[in-house]
From Swiss-Prot:
It comes from the Bacteria. The keyword Ion transport applies. Its main location: membrane. Pore-forming subunit of a potassium efflux system that confers protection against electrophiles. Catalyzes K(+)/H(+) antiport. It comes from Escherichia coli (strain K12). This is Glutathione-regulated potassium-efflux system protein KefB. The chain crosses the membrane at residues 4-24, 29-49, 55-75, 87-107, 115-135, 152-172, 177-197, 207-227, 230-250, 268-288, 291-311, 324-344, 356-376.
Amino acid sequence: MEGSDFLLAGVLFLFAAVAAVPLASRLGIGAVLGYLLAGIAIGPWGLGFISDVDEILHFSELGVVFLMFIIGLELNPSKLWQLRRSIFGVGAAQVLLSAALLAGLLMLTDFAWQAAVVGGIGLAMSSTAMALQLMREKGMNRSESGQLGFSVLLFQDLAVIPALALVPLLAGSADEHFDWMKVGMKVLAFVGMLIGGRYLLRPVFRFIAASGVREVFTAATLLLVLGSALFMDALGLSMALGTFIAGVLLAESEYRHELETAIDPFKGLLLGLFFISVGMSLNLGVLYTHLLWVVISVVVLVAVKILVLYLLARLYGVRSSERMQFAGVLSQGGEFAFVLFSTASSQRLFQGDQMALLLVTVTLSMMTTPLLMKLVDKWLSRQFNGPEEEDEKPWVNDDKPQVIVVGFGRFGQVIGRLLMANKMRITVLERDISAVNLMRKYGYKVYYGDATQVDLLRSAGAEAAESIVITCNEPEDTMKLVEICQQHFPHLHILARARGRVEAHELLQAGVTQFSRETFSSALELGRKTLVTLGMHPHQAQRAQLHFRRLDMRMLRELIPMHADTVQISRAREARRELEEIFQREMQQERRQLDGWDEFE
């Protein structure tokens, strides 16, 4: 692809994403499906703006690479060791069982047994990019089903190595083309990467961080991710596996959060590019000429994988409410199928349109997953949001709550317990199935689902409630929910959690005046105690705390129109001088009155 063509392709990708994804979100079908539909629209079988799909698809795998690096940063080696049973137990069983069943079915459709084996293995793999994206959207990351799903995906990445090595053996060309010496050298190189990364990465990043130049740190992070991906690709291994290992090696370093911040913008954009590329690769010509075969294949593929995954989840002891989430999110074919089937085609394992049919099946199965997960959500909503069972004794028996609490993590739990201790009628909305199960055991009235859905808010009693307390983890969800409440339930008093100063500005701009910055009050309290330990009288320290709080809130309100402007810097300096003057005056006025005060804790 020429430089100008590459630039044009980039503009088209960005335009497709900007146009399709907001529309898809508005229609309620999700960003992933929006990317896929955008890819179909601009690809060779749509408007035909881009024809070189294979090259772009290979480049777009960098989105998966960046995602796996961030996941590696979140998992230290000890946590990875704890997952060994689910990785090598459930993960291995899923690949072997799914591959065996799917290979058997392919043999019934005139595939040679060698081609059927390769096809079964390729179809048994799931899409790492899509599954992880959907797990994050559904709040599954910390749930039992989410952890098990990640373990299965990790084993699938490990299975790439033997799967690719198996292709020349099945093609009967092992003696001519399969060099065991090269395999040994690749294994040694891989081990060398592990050892080198273990002892070299932290000193290198310590040296780079000492320069104090943020851009250099970002460049070094990109070099690490792209370099490890290129190294693994040269070895014929999974690029995503290489960057995942690099992330794990740095998971316990002091640079973990800085690395994640540097990578995050690239991850999101490249993941979108990957999904658009998958949509572009959909061969509508093959779909048109073999429509019945493809439709049946997609249904059978998804059904077989759901069956295998559901049974394994049951054997592993996953709660019944989480099994369908686990099975549904991994039910599609994956990006590895494109690599494996291309390798098999070069070895002449496939005949006629067999490879094209398999790739169309994989692509369409990926498009069904967001829709399938919406159906799973509706099913779970009916299961959990129906009438209470007779043997349950919830805290709230009235269907008209006074308060709706959205999100019941550590922040929301404190609020909920305080309200319930004072006999307030509350209803909780939570999208983490594990949390829903736990709360119901303790008698909380809780609804499962996405609180940004108006119907769920109505069924939870929003039309009769007096207040709503929003404690979402994601700022985007908070702002979306504020907008929905103001539009559909204007009578509600909105109280919200702000993760930081920027979100506090956004809430004020949206008209929400009752909010709490999650670390501000606790930091102020600890600061007051620090002043006392440094010799300040407890009463004086309390007054200092109150003055600081008032001045900070005043600054927050004054700077709403320019919260992204450099004017904040000079205003902050003025506020600090003003605060110092207030403290000095009060210290002089109150010095005589402090002798009768004791520590008030």
